[in-house]
Curated annotation (Swiss-Prot):
SUPFAM superfamilies found in the cross-reference section: DNA/RNA polymerases
EC number(s) recorded for this UniProt protein: 2.7.7.48
Family: Belongs to the tombusviridae RNA polymerase family.
Cellular component GO terms, alphabetical: host cell mitochondrion
Record's protein name: RNA-directed RNA polymerase
Chain ranges of the RdRp catalytic domain: 491-607
UniProt feature coiled coil, ranges: none
Keyword Nucleotidyltransferase among record annotations: yes
Gene: ORF1
Cross-referenced Pfam families: RdRP_3
Species for this entry: Melon necrotic spot virus
Amino acid sequence: MDTGLKFLVSGGLATSSVIRKVSAVSSLDSSLPSSSILSAIHGSWTSAISHDCSKIAKVAAIVGIGYLGVRIGAAWCRRTPGITNSIITYGEEVVEQVKVDIDEDAEEESDIGEEIVVGTIGIGIHTNVNPEVRAKRRHRSRPFIKKIVNLTKNHFGGCPDSSKSNVMAVSKFVYEQCKQHNCLPHQTRLIMSIAVPLVLSPDMYDISSKALLNSEILTENRATLDRLKTLDGWLTHLVCHPLSAKAWRRAIDNLCGLPDWKAFKLVNXGCLEELAGFCTSVRRGTHPDMTEFPQDRPIKTRKLYCLGGVGTSVKFNVHNNSLANLRRGLVERVFFVENDKKELEPAPKPLSGAFDRLTWFRRKLHSIVGTHSSISPGQFLDFYTGRRRTIYEGAVKSLEGLSVQRRDAYLKTFVKAEKINTTKKPDPAPRVIQPRNVRYNVEVGRYLRRFEHYLYRGIDEIWNGPTIIKGYTVEQIGKIARDAWDSFVSPVAIGFDMKRFDQHVSSDALKWEHSVYLDAFCHDSYLAELLKWQLVNKGVGYASDGMIKYKVDGCRMSGDMNTAMGNCLIACAITHDFFRSRGIRARLMNNGDDCVVICEKECAAVVKADMVRHWRQFGFQCELECDAEIFEQIEFCQMRPVYDGEKYVMVRNPLVSLSKDSYSVGPWNGINHARKWVNAVGLCGLSLTGGIPVVQSYYNMMIRNTQSVNSSGILRDVSFASGFRELARLGNRKSGAISEDARFSFYLAFGITPDLQRAMESDYDAHTIEWGFVPQGNPRIQPISWTLNEL
């Protein structure tokens, strides 16, 4: 028996189960007959071999099925483009099937020959189109849907995430593509039903890109790079290289207290930058009423401070208060304007009797606001606080001893210290500030400061809704815009502003404006004399290296008490005359020279055709902006409405504001002062943008990096005064969750896709400000939001 087992094992004929069973047989009583023992061995061996064979067969079957599955999967992957193409082909075949119905609809639409009348003016007649010469529609060509899918994927950077905001954004983009190709509603619906699912699903390019990104060689390269960023400790180095002299020397140095080896690392020099102001390189034009007095003194360089690494690619700078800048500012912004050939010429004058056309508006306004009287100096002071009140208190005391004089209306001019967008215009004409003596402002303010509110409400009543957009929160402005939009069946918004409004305010315009004030104050002789001094302006411009004396007739002076009110009054009156004379119903949003008018889409052609010519009759150069058929694309005061999930909020254009808010015209006296300034900007910004994509994270980043700072002093400082601060004073928004509706609305407003919004927010949420000044002349730190590289 033992000999037989040895034979089976040595011969390799028995498996482990066979050996176990034969061993069990061998343990039987040896008194059994040999035939019985052999019979038992034969049975055990046969059953064991059968059992092992069945196991082998099962394993082979599993392996075979797995191999077959792999082959089928590979074949299926290779077949995926074919399936996608078949889906696209199916969609195009469906489009072709309804071709006849669509042609019939188009022919019915082309048979309309009725004249369209806007108000009292006809703007065109539909004419019949011969089907034989009708242009071939590109959407009927076979690769059209495939082209739409590729365009959309390129726009969204591949396959977008399946979020609600992305689905809406993709649908909107596909719809706009169909609209550009003049697809009819039937065709657009069919194309969207096919293209949108394809865009939201990965294709072979998406799969291949992800596979390449996670391939072994690229994964290994990334791991190698991460590993090389650090060095092993000296003990590990010695264990791995026991025969290396350098390893032993490194170990001995460490044991002796000498510095250890360190991996290469860039020096972090901080992100606070100090930029020097600049002087214009342009010198042209002269005027007989302007006399220069250069002085041999150095130019005082202004400073502009910047928080680097957080803004967009838009760059800003500041003009120095130099004689060259002052001269160009007066020549190009007071005495002359540019024509179409970029040549200087005097500002256009209004047509004779043009402002007589505004008599109806003036009388209607007077019937609403009624008559008023001047207020006392004390009541005037109650309108102000802080440093401005202190200045006016000194003027009031001065007037108690000496009444206002003609020389108090003379101008004291200087170059405005403001953030200049040098990316948009590298060397623009500097703006100048032309204030009069505060004694004169107090006397005019006693009449007009309180009256300003009544004037605005009167204009609102004439326009049948809020029109002068001053003193409102960003939510209130959004609601005003939405209410005006919803009051029309097929609304369109047309933006326009006047080129250098102050410069084009002629003497005739000032006289008409003054007549409105005099009507309200019963033609008060003292007020009439004060206002008359604004018709002929004498002034002296002061620079660090010289001065300029000049005289100009008319023009709006930036420091006058009635500058903002007068600009709004003139703009609203001229615009109202345009629509009233043409019988067109419209709503206006105005903030001085910045205007947006909302009307029916069928009226847009008349507005765009005649608006520029109408304003030219009053001596103004009107510039039309792109009309908006999507509510979120209305632009007013560099803001657009964004839906936060509950209501519309006006949001500043992040392509510019993210950079502009990182610059400071006021001085940073040290790192602690810079911290306070950054904190103040963050608090102001968050009060305007809480719950809004991207910008909420931007301002939260500023607050998070300055948590232990008290910025109340900065918020009151005169160097921090701006429209941004005044708007933020009215805001009370808080940081909160961002809804999918807000992301989609933000995409409609600014073109930033939801996925890109989340990516930028992740960058800002993880960003740490390095509090240190960068040496002057060093290149700017690369912004983390470099993707926003357009104006």
